Amino acid sequence: MSEIQLRPTVATDLQKLMALEHNTNSESVWQLELKRNTGQVSATFREVRLPRSIQVEYPHNKFALADDWVRKSMMYTAIMNNDQVGYLSLLERGTASVVWITDLVVDASFRRRGVASALLASAQGWAETRQHRRLILEMQSKNLPAIRLAQKFGYEFCGYNDHYYLNQDVALFFSKTLK
């Protein structure tokens, strides 16, 4: 198995990062059910297995990466066999104690090899050295692989936005308290 190397993203990485396969497949989704009663709104998410696997389109414009990366607080690139195989973007928003993971992408041919895990660990290390108290990871409710990864690393569901992405997909937010 090849070693995963992580480093801060540089401008020369961007073309290859934009060319990565950003979409994923999912066999289940987190389905939102809203119930509205007088003086009360109840939101429930339940995992629903689909009759067949669906392709989950990446919710951000991957071609805007060349413009957006300079606005990120930090961006890591994962390298295997001298190729860029994934990336993770971090953004300090609002309060200085919270960092958002806005992008976590691993090329399809390199998934299930520990790349996303290594990127998440680097994000946590970066946030801790900057004395942040919380990481928030965003993902689509259709992206069960990302939901499972968040849960595996101790992230807990902390909210949603039902029209967060341009394609109107539901965004889920998972957070992790740092030491």
Residue ranges and their predicted role:
Residues 107-113, 141-142:
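Active-site acidic-Proline motif in GNAT/NAT acetyltransferases
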Residues 11-12, 19-102, 107-109, 120-122, ...:
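Acetyl-CoA-dependent GNAT
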Residues 127-138:
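Conserved GNAT acetyl-CoA-binding A-motif
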Residues 59, 138-139, 154-172:
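Conserved catalytic-core motifs of GNAT/GCN5-like acyltransferases
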Residues 2-5:
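Extreme N-terminal starter segment of soluble prokaryotic enzymes
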Residues 146:
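Helix-turn-helix
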Residues 117:
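Residues forming the Rossmann-fold NAD(P)(H) cofactor-binding site
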